[in-house]
From Swiss-Prot:
It holds the Pfam family Ribosomal_L23. This is Large ribosomal subunit protein uL23. It comes from the Bacteria. Belongs to the universal ribosomal protein uL23 family. PANTHER family: 60S RIBOSOMAL PROTEIN L23A (PTHR11620). InterPro entries: Nucleotide-bd_a/b_plait_sf (IPR012677), Ribosomal_uL23-like (IPR013025), Ribosomal_uL23/eL15/eS24_sf (IPR012678). The lineage of its organism: Bacteria, Pseudomonadati, Pseudomonadota, Alphaproteobacteria, Rhodobacterales. One of the early assembly proteins it binds 23S rRNA. One of the proteins that surrounds the polypeptide exit tunnel on the outside of the ribosome. Forms the main docking site for trigger factor binding to the ribosome. Keywords: Ribonucleoprotein, Ribosomal protein, RNA-binding, rRNA-binding. The keyword Zinc does not apply. GO terms for biological process: translation. GO terms for molecular function: rRNA binding; structural constituent of ribosome.
Length: 98
């Protein structure tokens, strides 16, 4: 599959946290994705950008928290995360750039 410019708009960045590292043992990787992206679009983007076969895509939307900034309340943006499970034998090195 060839890489298209819109694939770079779907995947914002990889998420590297303790929880994301734990699920990577099960051949799953976590990415922050655009809010309007669908599961088929996420699957196509990951397969094209990283040259792997995707088994499943699960998504969650984390609501933004209310935080104080300079004494005034503000709201952080909502974040959509995609948990991408790969077929056996495939892997992604998220430490390297696209």
């Amino acid at each position: 599959m060839s890489v298209k410019p819109e694939h770079y708009d779907v995947i914002v960045k990889p998420i590297i946290t303790e929880k994301a590292t734990l699920v990577s043992d099960a051949n799953a990787y976590v990415f922050e994705v655009a809010k309007d992206s669908s599961k088929p679009a996420i699957k196509q983007a990951v397969e094209a950008l990283f040259n792997v076969k995707v088994k499943a895509v699960n998504t969650t939307i984390t609501k933004g928290k209310t935080k104080r900034f300079r004494g005034r309340p503000g709201v952080r943006s909502d974040v959509k995360k995609a948990y991408v499970t790969l077929e056996a034998g495939n892997s992604i090195d998220v430490s390297t750039g696209l």
